[in-house]
Amino acid sequence: ARHCPTEAIRIRAGRAVINAHRCIDCGVCIGVCPHKAKHATFASLDAMDRFSYKIALPAPSLYGQFGGLEDIDYIIDGLYALGFDDVYEVASAAELVSAYTRMYMATPGIKKPVISSACPTVTRLISMRFPYLRNNIMPMLPPMEIAAKLAKRRAIKAHPALAPEQIGVCFISPCPAKVSYVKNGFGAYKSAVDVVVSTAEIYFALLGVMKPHETPRHACESGAIGVAWASSGGESTAIFNEKYLAADGIENVVRVLDQIENGNMQGLDFIELNACPGGCVGGVMTVENPFIAKARIRSLRRYLPISQNAPQKGEDYVPADYFFDEMPSYTPMTRLSENLGESMRLMAHMEEVHRALPGIDCGACGAPSCRAFAEDVVRGQAQLYDCVVSMRKTIRDYASQMHLTPQNEAADTEVNDS
């Protein structure tokens, strides 16, 4: 529970319970829990059976999962062998996003530093804990969404007889945050992705159909710039601006956002933040160690052209449908009531409860900190006597008033006297 950056986890009746209102889907709990109490939820490949025309959207992090592979084409071939009718690489859309980001960064009057919107966990974290930075978020759809839009357009163009509802887009995700993003959307925006499966599931399925000793029939349609998005720093280097910062790992992300909010990040134009360690290669729905996957991605890039995707000639603007309809609203974690007066009263009560607690953050109550426990008490989700330390003190004080000695203290006294 203590590892959760938004204190969304409580231990109730011996089980870990997640507060969905606070959860940002960072996956830290999945990665650190030795008992595997929590796991990511995602669809299986069978969910694509309801579509007549199936499109795979492989995230670039998928390419770093396979050892001894020197050509991405074999992975593309393998996806076709799994039954997909088309493969649209998210790395291809990432190259377009890189180009559009350069255009956006040149827009006069935008608020800087611009914070990438590629990681759903980061954008949700900002909307909950750093509301003053919401206007710094780049209002552009992430590569996954643009890839889904372009893939469906390509399918309709190639097969005019297909109805839109017959076309299914399956994103191969390295993390649970993108699963939640597809389910819930971004603000008022509804995702163009239909199904999300885990990288791990596709990895094991591909092992059975890939043929590395045969000449691949399909070619990779992305370049080094797009594939580099798989690891931290790849997005930043693609915008050709030296005034950037790239950080990964949720704890580092929180520190950077704190610094930006406090005005300590002057002189920077672009901020790339990835909740997963090492970037998307470190997602909890992957298979390979993120550092090994990052090294493989770096090796694969050597065989690729710089880029294979760019805006159409003469297109010096970002298409309107590549922007979010609206930015996420402020959703404070500690809002105790919709009524301002009642909320202030409850906040004062929470501070009063917090002052009465020992302040040692032992976690015995099931909350990650004494402040979190005080909030639970005010919300009616816990009782003050759930704090073991406070309860023992209360019993001790009560016994003292009654001129009694608690049994355990009496035993200690006898031992010391002897």
What do these predicted regions represent?
Residues 1-34, 127-131, 136, 140:
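Helix-enriched interaction subdomains in cytosolic or periplasmic regions
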Residues 40-363, 368-418:
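Iron-sulfur-associated redox domains of electron-transfer enzymes in respiratory
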